Amino acid sequence: NEFLARWDLRPELVEVADGRPNLLCTVEGGSPGPHLLLCGHTDTVPLNETDPGVGFSGRVEDGRLWGRGATDMKGAVAAMAAALAALYQTGRLSAGRMTLAAVIDEEIESLGAEHLIRSGFQADGAIVGEPTRNRVCIGHKGLEWLEMVFEGKA
């Protein structure tokens, strides 16, 4: 939020759960065109007893950052925020819109992404910065919650 605001962008914090907002920030191009979503999550896998002492340290070793969420997915969210700020500052987004959505709770219930969808947010395309071992993925597994009722005789 502070990084984007420093670049004269207007990030918006949208409350999703108690004290846990999604961050949305949109840059408008100079003319109409497609809307691209840059999406990442701000939570991490919960700590457990088997973690190798890294936790939330943010330790830098041999020029690399080690710590919870460094690759999944704080690095991608930071890169997307920097890209959005650069496009805005240089005026290089000539058409369309680009929105950064940093959503909460991807690792447990996907509350942030669900809130974004239920709010009516729409885009023509999306880049999700999940780590993929440096391979471009054009699809990914997802989840769907269903409630079913069956009636009859067994």
Language-model features: where?
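Acidic/His- and Gly-rich active-site-bordering loop/insert found
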Residues: 1-68, 89-94, 104
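Fold-level recognition of mixed alpha/beta catalytic cores in primary-metabolism enzymes, strongest
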Residues: 65, 71, 75-154
